[in-house]
């Protein structure tokens, strides 16, 4: 989450640090998934706090035993820029990569529910106070990304570099 050392020294000096709820307490480096229980059914939820959702590998590891992804965020930092909408798009990519529905709660950004194919199934607009009531599904199984991670991309990049190097060696031009 948003944890800044010595941020108390900066309050009043830098406007950025005067935002409400702009600092959280540091938690343990490794945390277990949260178990959601509703109507007698329960499932693990992989949690990403704020911008943690931007890190595919981290969310991939958390999602291994989870049936749903969740992210809680404070998008106040972005103001009225396109930042909150980009943040939501990043979260949608995590839903697709992991084949899991994503529940996203934002106190000043876009709150929404995204299905396992990245489709927005419900949302509250930015700067709107309200409650989003919608349905979601608990998912199981793996996707190519959840099984292999970034390795296929790295192998393709390596092959491209080797191919370009080989071509430069033969023709002297890339």
Each language-model region and where it sits:
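Enzyme catalytic cores with a strong preference for nitrogen-chemistry domains
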Residues: 1-174
């Amino acid at each position: 989450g948003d944890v800044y050392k010595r941020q108390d020294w900066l309050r009043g000096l830098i406007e950025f640090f005067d935002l409400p709820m702009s600092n959280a307490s540091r938690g343990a480096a490794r945390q277990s998934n949260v178990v959601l229980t509703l109507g007698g059914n329960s499932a693990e939820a992989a949690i990403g706090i704020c911008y943690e959702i931007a890190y595919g590998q981290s969310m991939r590891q958390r999602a291994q035993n989870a049936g749903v992804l969740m992210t809680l965020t404070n998008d106040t930092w972005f103001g009225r820029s396109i930042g909150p909408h980009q943040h939501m798009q990043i979260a949608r990519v995590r839903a697709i990569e992991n084949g899991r529905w994503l529940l996203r709660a934002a106190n000043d950004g876009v709150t929404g529910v995204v299905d396992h194919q990245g489709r927005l199934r419900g949302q509250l607009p930015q700067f709107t106070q309200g409650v989003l009531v919608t349905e979601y599904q608990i998912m199981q199984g793996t996707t190519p990304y959840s099984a292999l991670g970034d390795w296929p991309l790295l192998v393709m990049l390596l092959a491209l570099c080797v191919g370009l190097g080989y071509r430069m060696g033969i023709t002297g031009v890339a």
